[in-house]
Amino acid sequence: MTRLVWFCMQVAYCLHGWDWDIMDRGRSSNSYDSLWGGKARDNPIVSQLPLQYRIRSALTQEQQTAYQVMYRIQEITIKLRTNDLNPPTSRYRSLSPPPVYDSQGKRTNTREHRYRKKLEEERHRLVEIALKMIPHFIAPDDYRRPSKFQDKYYIPINDYPEINFVGLLLGPRGNTLKQLQQQSGCKIVIRGRGSVKEGKAATDLPKGAMNMNEPLHCVISADTEEKIPLGINAVESIIIKAITSPEGQNDLKRGQLRELAVLNGTLREDNRPCPLCGEQGHKKWECSSNPSLSMTVICQRCNQPGHAARDCTSPLNEFGKRTSDGPEFRETKKLQQDAPPPSGPVGSHPSAPGSGSANSGVAPASLHPPGTMAPPGALPPPGSLAAPGTLPPPAALPAPAAPGTLPPPVALPAPATLPQAGVPPAPDASPAVKTAVPIEGPPAPPQTAPPLRQTAATASSAGSSQSAQEEPENARNGVEKAAPGPPAAVLPPPPPPPPPPPPPPSS
């Protein structure tokens, strides 16, 4: 009996092929077929396909994949053309979503609509694969490539209500969301309940922003399907960092707060450069290049900068004068003592006797540029005054002259003369030379003969001292100094009067 059954099976296989309808082996005919089951002759679309569903030759792995992609694209295209949108019957079906209606009251998410949308998305994905894998591939005629691909990422706001996910995604003035869009190449929009602040009108928001039926989520759209995962990963990284970071240790949030302070102009940090010199490490009021007015004020009691005499707090010594024992005072005093003596002729120091500056109150000639005269009552600059309690340096002694030499005679300046009325000029004088009479003034000091050993340097210094003494006198009397010119002609002395006549002889 067993051999007879085996023989019948061999005959059936040779005549009809291996068919499970003939060889059901006692199974019920009401059993559900799997998704991959079914017979080719029961599918009316197979007869319309130009490609064969049975491959009778050996193909490589790439050829098999390309053949399957093209076969599936043609199958989906025929289904969409013939409007064959009956979903396959399955034992296990997912729950249907809640109904969604349009503005006209028609339902937009029926089973047929969802199945059509699923087929279109599958064909879009297969066409993208075929364009990269199969050379010279041509898409179906009724195929329209979508302008953008879209996906959603739901934010777990119900699990973590204490975290401000919307603020972290947006950032200060939306800069964080702009950076995510630039990095991923996708457009990211926050939609759902909690994405819009209370009090905003629907006219001020874009289309779809007021759809509060869905929970809080991010809508990620791009022109290619490969960019969608990049946008989802960018949003997911921020959500995970906000969930896993302890409170106060979220680097992203601290960076956003710092950026917001910079935008508002309220950032306070220690490493900002100085606005005066541009260097770091000090504040504006600590900058050494900032000219301080208080450092230009010098106390007249302790000679210290930074305060006036009435604010001086230096102690009084036994003489009733202000003293200062601070390091700054000692350093200033040491610099004044170590300063070299002033260079110049003897008598030019303001405290030197006989220079004429102590009595007249005019600064010495060495403190003014050559060719200028100090005004009456002018005081020398503060830097030239000696410190209180210090003596001027001793005057330099002239070098001894060689023995047996006499100094040259001292040349006295010619007295200023004015023209005298009624006196004709001398016959020898040129017409350009005019006679002048001396101006009455204070008597000149008596001229003393220089010592025998006076050198030329001493004589020249004495002459300059005398000329410096005469300049203040002339300035005080209002007489201008005559320009140097040719020597004036000196009139000869008048002849002596004739002797009186002798008396007549007496008789």
From Swiss-Prot:
| Gene Ontology MF terms | mRNA binding; pre-mRNA branch point binding; zinc ion binding
Zinc fingers (CCHC-type) by residue? 272-289, 297-314
The biased composition feature labelled Low complexity covers: 345-376, 450-469
List, as start-end ranges, the regions of compositional bias called Polar residues: 84-93
List, alphabetically, the PROSITE patterns matched. Answer: KH_TYPE_1 (PS50084), ZF_CCHC (PS50158)
**InterPro entries given for it?**
BBP-like, KH_1_KHDC4/BBP-like, KH_dom, KH_dom_type_1_sf, SF1-HH, SF1-HH_sf, Znf_CCHC, Znf_CCHC_sf
Alphabetical list of SUPFAM superfamilies matching this protein = Eukaryotic type KH-domain (KH-domain type I), Retrovirus zinc finger-like domains
Region annotation (Disordered) maps to 84-110, 307-507
Biased composition, Basic and acidic residues: where in the chain? 319-336
Gene Ontology CC terms, in alphabetical order: commitment complex; cytosol; nucleus
Is Repeat one of the keywords? yes
**Domain (KH) ranges:** 154-220
Q: Pfam families, per this entry?
A: KH-I_KHDC4-BBP, SF1-HH, zf-CCHC
Annotated Pro residues bias: 390-412, 440-449, 484-507
Report the protein's function.
Necessary for the splicing of pre-mRNA. Has a role in the recognition of the branch site (5'-UACUAAC-3'), the pyrimidine tract and the 3'-splice site at the 3'-end of introns.
- PANTHER family referenced in this protein's UniProt entry, alphabetically: RNA-BINDING PROTEIN RELATED (PTHR11208), SPLICING FACTOR 1 (PTHR11208:SF45)
The family annotation for this protein states:
Belongs to the BBP/SF1 family.
According to UniProt, the name of this protein is Branchpoint-bridging protein
Q: Which organism is it from?
A: Eremothecium gossypii (strain ATCC 10895 / CBS 109.51 / FGSC 9923 / NRRL Y-1056) (Yeast)
Q: Which gene encodes it?
A: BBP
